[in-house]
């Protein structure tokens, strides 16, 4: 469980996760696994669910430079997810999420230097160079399907488990998310998809070569809230983002967030 209290806005947020795991004891205890996750409560969430900036970094950039990059909203939520992993290298996942989304507003413009107060921005994402996207309270019901597969997976067989040795082939992934309207008051209606390929090559004395390429888009964008846009993991802080393979070090956090029919992006390390 997690408990969060805002001393300025006096909001109490509390939420918890329950995970249930099962294994195939007949053959091995690790490679074949099912996981059920139940979550619910009231929380504060970044608009980009990949959490491009952490709380400590955002606090430091705000206090020292007046740059409050983290943009968040409050939500009552409930979710259920199921994942199953097979020893063949196949992994599937299903999830359903309900959110009652509530705007959060700044309650202070405090910085260590008064001259930096003018840099403080609203707690809403800025698309492009200056297009601030506001939203009003609404509800959303989302269902998602994920599948990933790494062909040619090899293992070492032990008496009660298997140890994966990897594969010479990349990992392929697919995600489909549907925003369903008129269920539990849901106000969203969209369909989006993403296909990805990634790999980590050991070049021995030359080091390692990692890459990740994704293509996707919106098949239906009839009613898309800013929380459900396609976001990219940018970085505007004065320090490098931790995961080079899934982030863009010089990209503004929400500059290219979109509901386009098609997009493609990639990372190489």
Give the residues covered by each predicted segment.
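Strand-loop-strand
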Residues: 11-30
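Residues on the lipid-exposed face of transmembrane beta-strands in outer-membrane beta-barrel proteins
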Residues: 3, 16-22, 40, 80-84, ...
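Transmembrane beta-strand segments of outer-membrane beta-barrel domains in Gram-negative
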Residues: 50-203
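Charged/polar, low-hydrophobicity segments characteristic of intrinsically disordered regions
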Residues: 17-21, 111-114, 184, 228-231
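Short helix-terminating capping/connector loops at secondary-structure junctions
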Residues: 29-32, 165
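Structural signature of outer-membrane beta-barrel domains
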Residues: 6-10, 23, 41-47, 83, ...
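C-terminal outer-membrane beta-barrel translocator/porin domains of Gram-negative envelope proteins
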Residues: 35-56, 60-73, 133, 164, ...
